[in-house]
């Protein structure tokens, strides 16, 4: 099961033959120096992912060969972020449609999972996006769907995809600090599982595996369209 310790989701074993005792520095505050406590607080602010693993004790669960190895979790999406817009990936039966709010603070990319569900019609996506009043950068694979959402009053634009566009988006994301809101469970899961593909000999190649990536694809469309100017004319 998951329990929350100082805002960090920590896995606790529930196996009947296991007694899992999880302690942190909060259980020993009276014996810790002010210098140590300040170091821990600084880590919490400046490197929340390290704080989660090293201090609070969340299990390291980034997959081997992970594309994104350094990213953090924050409580809230910053209201002062710039270039705020949605990245939108479309799915239906088996794949979810993902609506990810994205924004920039200095060289940091902030991400907030607003919707992540299967079986959504264009009318459902419109209901999700309309209250925000933000620009949307979307997958260009289904022009009909983009037109329907546009007709619903949404400022939606199709991203320009082509040879090398996947890696271009990934490279730009890796050049930035990435922070994901703590409520964005599906997006966090994708970032942990998103790995480079392997060739027939088991060697990693410069191409990610194409699964568990719907939220990440939505973010990549935002990066391509809003930050790199790759919008279909």
Q: At which residue positions do the language-model features occur?
A:
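Gly/Thr-rich phosphate-binding beta-strand-loop-beta motif of the actin/hexokinase/Hsp70
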Residues: 79-103
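ATPase catalytic-site recognition across NTP-hydrolyzing enzymes
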Residues: 29-88
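Mg2+-dependent endonuclease catalytic cores in nucleic-acid-processing enzymes, primarily RNase H-like
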Residues: 100-207, 227-230
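Short, conserved catalytic or adaptor-binding loops enriched in Gly and charged residues
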Residues: 8-16, 58, 75-77, 169-173
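A residue-level signal for conserved active-site and pocket-lining positions in enzyme catalytic cores
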Residues: 23, 55, 89, 99, ...
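ASCE P-loop NTPase helicase motor core
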Residues: 1-41
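Acidic, Mg2+-coordinating catalytic module of metal-dependent nucleases/exonucleases
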Residues: 210-231
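Conserved beta-strand scaffold positions in the cores of enzyme catalytic domains, especially
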Residues: 18-22, 85, 156
